[in-house]
Design a protein with these regions (language model features):
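A beta-strand edge to alpha-helix "cap/lid" segment located at domain peripheries
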Residues: 1-27, 37-130
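ATP/adenylate-binding site constellation spanning eukaryotic-like Ser/Thr protein kinases
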Residues: 33
Length: 130
């Protein structure tokens, strides 16, 4: 039985999480659309293109130690060759000797390109921890 579009999108997001959690950021570029945009929290800037977006993971992982990361199942809506997914997460990390605990939602837009679902847009929205 072939995977549904939602299952394929879920697998693409799981692949992204696995890559950054394992520090394998070199593999992330292949998961991103060539014109990908990551909008910074609060819409306070943006990273454009694969190289710049992968660098956001590299910078975070170089500067911090992730102590805990949990995410919920994503909510996925598919419209032809476009999908919108939201993913709730909670994380604790140390940066510069200071601990932070945060929670929020990642919002992704994915496009089907050559039979693969690629991340084309992402932002993060902070939310209170549960």
């Amino acid at each position: 039985m072939p995977e549904s579009d939602s299952q394929q999108v879920r697998a693409a997001l799981a692949g992204l999480t696995a890559a950054w959690r394992k520090g394998k950021t070199a593999s992330i570029g292949a998961m991103l659309h060539p014109s990908v945009v990551f909008v910074h929290p609060g819409f306070a800037g943006r990273a454009e293109g694969r190289t710049a977006c992968v660098a956001t993971y590299d910078e975070f992982l170089r500067a911090s130690i992730v102590l805990r990361y949990e995410e919920k199942e994503p909510s996925i809506d598919v419209f032809g060759d476009t999908a919108v997914a939201t993913l709730r997460w909670e994380m604790a990390w140390e940066m510069g000797g200071q601990r932070s605990d945060d929670a929020g939602h990642d919002v992704y837009v994915l496009v089907r390109d050559g039979g693969r679902w690629l991340i084309a847009w992402r932002t993060l929205i902070s939310a209170p921890p549960t």
